[in-house]
Amino acid sequence: MTYRPATDPPDLDTLTLGVEEEFLLLDSDTGESMPVAARVLDGLSGTAYEQSRREFRHSMVEMVTPVVSDLAELRRHLVALRTAAAEAAESAGAHLVAVGATPVNETHRTVPDEPRYHAMSRRFGPVAHDPAVCGCHVHVGLPDRELAVQVCNHLRPWLPVVQAITANSPLHDGQDTGHASWRAMQLERWPSIGPTPYFDSAADYDATVADLIKAGIMLDAGMVYWYVRPSAAFPTVEIRVGDVCPTVDDTVLVAALVRALVATLAADVRDGARATRIRGCLVSAAHWRAAHDGLDGDLVDLRTGHARPAWDLVDELFALVAPALERQGDRAYVLDQLARLRDEGTGAARQRRILERTGCDVRAVLAHLAAQTRPVPA
């Protein structure tokens, strides 16, 4: 289709941001999940309480930043929200942990007493009671919905790279799974989670979602959990592919890259560029490889279908978005953070180094995760 701009298109150099981070509540001694979310939320006050959300497990909480316009403001909110949630978790006898999948065990898998959660549990059975997983969802303001759908099409080749950068869940049931993101593997059991299909238009998107609801694949439009989507609730493009990041700096890096990528691709759409229709099986394979290798191996370059070193694709992603980052004032920050990431590795790589150093002491990994989750006071 040919994109027709909205009457008042957004300034692509000043796109707004918002971030949702999901966290586990774990026992500090055993690492097992603790069903104390209600106590944690009740322990919050002020802005932190207003920006908190109940999640699909009693052992999870979500913290949501306000809409922001720059990275410094985003970082301040992330630090404040993580600090408040960590303190409330400690008061409830738990650690707040930013990790993509339940690392040890989840004894209590009942869902909170809310009609929607019960409906999901009835419809999807044991899948709804899999161990809890935590993601990082980045919203980029893009009120033109037609433009948002086309940007989603253009994002498809780059989302495995974003997924690899965020990989932060190698453990399951106390063992190394061999995957950098076990969260991604676990979520494949849901029928409405995974790579976003290609859509010709916003009308095509809406018709497909309506068909899936009629077919019983999802309860409503809120259950479109594809890796990127026009948000069902906000005038944004929502990127949902990533594990929750271990540190605030990791989250800000991902948000900066995603915003610059959306700005770059939205400009391409306005200039008449059409997204390539990539075969769904190849897109799925690329995401599997990203979840398996993270940044410590190869990724599938969806522009060619060939496997390439992961960091080559990260470098090409940076080169693509560097002009947008420059205009947004974020280029130097992102360059520094990518250098740090190259040195430290993904969250999954950091966990594995601790396992190797401690003789597979999972408790040491959990202590490390809890320490990374809570920002160090300035």
Curated annotation (Swiss-Prot):
InterPro entries: GCL_type2/YbdK_subfam, GCS2, Gln_synth/guanido_kin_cat_dom, YbdK. Its EC number is 6.3.2.2. It is an enzyme of class 6 (ligase). Keywords: ATP-binding, Ligase, Nucleotide-binding. GO terms for molecular function: ATP binding; glutamate-cysteine ligase activity. GO terms for biological process: modified amino acid biosynthetic process. It catalyses: L-cysteine + L-glutamate + ATP = gamma-L-glutamyl-L-cysteine + ADP + phosphate + H(+). Belongs to the glutamate--cysteine ligase type 2 family. YbdK subfamily. ATP-dependent carboxylate-amine ligase which exhibits weak glutamate--cysteine ligase activity. PANTHER family: GLUTAMATE--CYSTEINE LIGASE 2-RELATED. This is Putative glutamate--cysteine ligase 2. It comes from Salinispora tropica (strain ATCC BAA-916 / DSM 44818 / JCM 13857 / NBRC 105044 / CNB-440).
